[in-house]
Amino acid sequence: MQDRFVHCIAQLPQPLADQLVPLLNQDFVGHMDAQQVADLAAATQMSQDELLLALLPIAAALAKPPISEFYVGAIAKGASGDIYMGANLELDGEALFHSVHAEQSAISHAWLSGETGIEDIIVNASPCGHCRQFMNELVEGQAIRIHLPEQATQPLSHYLPYAFGPADLNIKTPLLSKQQHEFTLESADPMIIEALDHLSLSYAPYSESYAAVVLETRDGATFCGRYAENAAFNPSMLPMQMALSAMARHNRDFSEINRAVLIESSQGKISLVGATMDALHAVAAVELEHIMVDPV
């Protein structure tokens, strides 16, 4: 079992802890498929809602909050029935806008894994306004069920009434809808090809500044992030923060980064290069490779 889970496993009901210990091996990054969830519920004689709330300490153990020291865990349940854990991330000594909220982390985990819908969000503290707006960008966002400890389950519309969202700006394919934007680039570099793939799946309907980041560690592992814009602009999630959040879930140290690539559309109304460099240089002494590509 990974060291980061040792403390939280002791907080769980013993039957659940016994079932989880074999799962929390070195490969565990916060994802459980629908069958694993069903098996855990059966083995522990818990309802699925009870189980997911009980798993929140595991999700919170994925957090890196050096500023607030407040560990928040979230779980996104996808339309597939799989669950995706996420946790808050803060960059030590840096401006707070670099932070990733737990709900953003969980949702980006699901998006990067190919989910096209989120049905439930389980979180150990009431979602802040930033996260409510971020969730409202999703497919059928207002219908997402929000689960909190010791509170009745409510749809997002309960927490964000009279919401402003993508439909108000005539966006017909909100976040998690299949995106496929075509760009031209000739490269045999596997890392750049991977970045191009994620660029084509990014979500930027307001600025058309489609973008993706790929980070490579010294052992050759790669971690990706895509731009996820928001109708309210400020809750948009930058690709560098998404990639760093993925690294944190994988229990990797940012000092392991030895290469970083940002790829973005040449036709966007904005550029993410400045914000991306700021975040990268806060965690690693690596120069950013910046590539602009033309849409087809």
UniProtKB/Swiss-Prot annotation:
PROSITE patterns with a match to the protein in the record: CYT_DCMP_DEAMINASES_1 (PS00903), CYT_DCMP_DEAMINASES_2 (PS51747)
Domain CMP/dCMP-type deaminase: 47-167, 186-296
Binding site for Zn(2+): H101, C128, C131
Active site: E103
GO biological process: cytidine deamination
An annotated Gene Ontology molecular function: cytidine deaminase activity
Listed NCBIfam families: PRK09027.1
Function as written in the Swiss-Prot or TrEMBL entry: This enzyme scavenges exogenous and endogenous cytidine and 2'-deoxycytidine for UMP synthesis.
Family: Belongs to the cytidine and deoxycytidylate deaminase family.
Subunit relationships: Homodimer.
Protein name: Cytidine deaminase
Organism: Shewanella loihica (strain ATCC BAA-1088 / PV-4)
Lineage: Bacteria, Pseudomonadati, Pseudomonadota, Gammaproteobacteria, Alteromonadales
